[in-house]
């Protein structure tokens, strides 16, 4: 019985990381979409907005990397 529960816990951890990765991908999509929308409104700010977009994408992807790190740490 204990081995079955261990297998279920391992599967739940994998599902949890998968959901975290999906959340990160949605976040990146929102950041990039809003940047494109902002550049369409004010093209003169394109360079500054692009830099801010990369910072936002980096922070969003860092959450996914933290998620995979905790998955391997607590596995």
Swiss-Prot record:
Cystine connections: none
Predominant subcellular localization, coarse grouping: membrane
Entry keywords, A to Z: ATP synthesis, Cell membrane, CF(0), Hydrogen ion transport, Ion transport, Lipid-binding, Membrane, Transmembrane, Transmembrane helix, Transport
UniProt function note: F(1)F(0) ATP synthase produces ATP from ADP in the presence of a proton or sodium gradient. F-type ATPases consist of two structural domains, F(1) containing the extramembraneous catalytic core and F(0) containing the membrane proton channel, linked together by a central stalk and a peripheral stalk. During catalysis, ATP synthesis in the catalytic domain of F(1) is coupled via a rotary mechanism of the central stalk subunits to proton translocation.
Stored SUPFAM superfamilies: F1F0 ATP synthase subunit C
Quaternary assembly: F-type ATPases have 2 components, F(1) - the catalytic core - and F(0) - the membrane proton channel. F(1) has five subunits: alpha(3), beta(3), gamma(1), delta(1), epsilon(1). F(0) has three main subunits: a(1), b(2) and c(10-14). The alpha and beta chains form an alternating ring which encloses part of the gamma chain. F(1) is attached to F(0) by a central stalk formed by the gamma and epsilon chains, while a peripheral stalk is formed by the delta and b chains.
Domain of life from the UniProt record: Bacteria
Cellular compartment(s): Cell membrane
Gene: atpE
Designated name of the protein: ATP synthase subunit c
A UniProt-annotated Pfam family: ATP-synt_C
Annotated positions for site Reversibly protonated during proton transport: 61
Single Gene Ontology MF annotation: proton-transporting ATP synthase activity, rotational mechanism
Cellular component annotations (GO), alphabetically ordered: plasma membrane; proton-transporting ATP synthase complex; proton-transporting two-sector ATPase complex, proton-transporting domain
Membrane-spanning parts: 12-32, 49-69
Keyword Nucleus assigned: no
UniProt organism field: Tropheryma whipplei (strain Twist) (Whipple's bacillus)
Family according to the record: Belongs to the ATPase C chain family.
The UniProt record lists the keyword Transmembrane helix: yes
Membrane-related topology note: Multi-pass membrane protein
